[in-house]
């Protein structure tokens, strides 16, 4: 019998990780409920019930959960991949924005099909990820600082480019709006992600498309790269100890840059699949898109595990869809605060790991003393 099999169940890393995530979710929900009670005691139970039940109340709502989970999952994979390689990619929002721009550029300006647009989204995100990687690898500049800067640079650059490309804007396709890109169903229906098998299952009213399948495939692919390949081992080795990796003959500078490029590409795909759904238009922004930042709690809740990211993204999407059903008992601002509390407290999985480990070790010591 292997050593892994002899190890007590509650001491196995995989089991502890799952328990930590579940405990974090419970704590987040409890504190969210307390906040609802403080704000409107009479509606707290009904509000929490609506939040937890709405996602399964109809096929349309379930489809919306899956639709919103797809870009969240890609951003979570992006942040989690960087975490696994010892980097903190807080620039996922900028990479997401560049991915959205590249995909829409191919869709509207060049009239290309959806799969080419999605590839362009990955390239856009990768390009925006390479700069923080280069600064980190060759000048040892903290990637948090550079990636935050590139979030803002990316947003304003996209605004500038779109403002000077009339054919990209809705006003260039007969609409009155000049502050957003053209609707894909007007400009290029062939660039909209197909609905595949979901059309018959969820009906025409649902927004769901094959993006959820694409993101699950990417999650599995990232897991295989990190866990089953030499390349993934080298990336993680650089993250654990750059000096030790160099001593072992691993090119740490190259791997740091590649880590940020891959992480950026994943965020870029997230931006691509969101806007290629055909349900929204990119609006010239005055603040950074929040989707990239939402990838951080997705990754933390999953302990940066690519497979766990699938479930954490689904949970966060489910809470967001359910939160909309809490009106009119609660204002939209209140709902946003409650959802934020639940999501960010649910991301304390690492802290909960320590709590579980301490509880298990304490029980083990008591058992040993009793003997």
Segment roles from a protein language model:
Residues 20-37, 72-79, 100, 104-106, ...:
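Hydrophobic core segments of alpha-helical transmembrane domains in multi-pass membrane transport
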Residues 127, 194, 202-281, 306-307, ...:
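Helix-loop-helix "hairpin" substructures at the membrane interface of multi-pass membrane proteins
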Residues 1-25, 240, 247, 251-254, ...:
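Cytosolic-side transmembrane-helix boundaries in multi-pass membrane proteins
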Residues 54, 59, 151-226, 334, ...:
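Transmembrane helix-bundle core of multi-pass membrane transporters
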Residues 261-340:
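Transmembrane alpha-helical segments in multi-pass inner-membrane proteins
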Residues 2-74:
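Membrane-interfacial amphipathic/re-entrant helices at transmembrane-helix boundaries
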Residues 36-41, 53-109, 122, 126-141, ...:
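Single transmembrane alpha-helix segments in multi-pass membrane proteins
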Residues 7-19, 83-91, 110, 122-188, ...:
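Short loop segments and helix-boundary regions at transmembrane helix junctions
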